[in-house]
Amino acid sequence: MKFLALPLFCAAWAFAILPNENLSQGKMAYVDGNDSSAYLTDGSLTNWKYKESKNVALHIGEGPSKVFVSWELYSFGGIDWADFALACPHTKTLLTDFAILTSANSTTGFDGDWDTAYVVTQNQVLARGVAVDFEGKSWIRLVSDDNAGQFLEVEVFDISNGQNDTWFFMGTSISAMGIKQQDSDTTKTTAMLIHEQFPDFTPAMLRGGVSCINTTDIVNHLPEYLEAVGNVNFWAIEMGTNDGWGGGTWNLSTYVQNLQTIIDAAKAYGISVVLARTLATDSSKAGWQLAPEFLAAEDSLIQVNGLYQGPDFYAFFKEHPEYLASDGVHPNGETGGGAAMHRLWAEAIAPIYADTTSAIYSHRKRASSASPSLVKVIVNGGSVEIRTPKGNSVQNFDAKGRIAH
């Protein structure tokens, strides 16, 4: 249990992001009992750096009481997060039914005693993360009876104090191609860029782009989205291209209603939404441009719902069409369109981390000379309690910033 003394007007600090250290970065992954690979823990999603396996183990070491285990798959050429788009079918993930095991005494990742910490059944997505109890353990292992496909990355984060630095990037083929980091092996992801600017933070980020998908598809599959990624703290949303395809406004009202439904569902799960402005096409190649009414609707939704403002993909790609492919719509890997998307996302969400970093520094200074005139913020595991100088509890918040009753 930790105590911080804060002035009363700083109570909003209860909503700050809590760092969840990446424990697996650079660790060796042991594959199928007799192989090892640094591909799976290098932070890169470059498509050729994968391992086909149904048994992956990582030595994390002792310390954390709880960890967030995430994985990214390639699925034999498929980059789409799920087969949820009515307009076009996608390659389904092979990693459907599997278990996550933990061990305290393994020496190789395959010997020793193992406990089943989490079981996943009927999984439909290529990227996902789950919270796992890790008290007294030192090894993590993913085990599937069937072929699991191609692992791009396996990451393990320390969430002993909460898991609210966790992100899901919901999007279209623009995100499927851009956020999947296909530009080159040197492309820096949004998570890498945030870590460079704010070294205390190593965000857990799941990529969720689906080609051909529109907001109606997402609303129709909201139960599946919430089952797979309802446990993260932020949904970073890139949508609108397929809803506004062709440049007309015939689908505008449906788009707005669908986005509001998605926002409401996220909020009901304690998820904060960051909404990007829809990407501009290169109209000389695509033959159309997004109607400005879509942008106005997105701006209104951000204001009305109190959302975080995401990147302005429209303004950037309107000014820099050279980052788009020959179809005039998708980020061009050869010219760095994907890298630009990662940079724009990092720039958009950096203020969230800047506010947190500033608050923590300020509060540490004040805590060192605390006086009875200051309120107390009590951090106990994943919850935060604010108390007045008289000891009265003002409010309790969980690690996601939600009121804890």
Label every model-predicted segment.
Residues 17-66, 72-81, 89-93, 104-113, ...:
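Disordered, acidic Ser/Thr/Pro-rich linker "stalks" and the adjacent N-terminal cap
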Residues 31-32, 77-81, 88-159:
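Trp- and acidic/polar-enriched beta-sheet ligand-binding modules for extracellular glycan
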Residues 136-208, 222-231:
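Serine-esterase "nucleophile elbow" of acetyl-processing enzymes
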Residues 179, 215-256, 279-281:
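Oxyanion-hole/transition-state-stabilizing segment in secreted/luminal serine hydrolases
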Residues 238-242, 262-295:
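Active-site segments of SGNH/GDSL-like serine hydrolases
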Residues 244, 280-361:
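Catalytic His-Asp segment of secreted/periplasmic serine-dependent ester chemistry enzymes
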Residues 361-405:
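C-terminal outer-membrane/trafficking sorting elements
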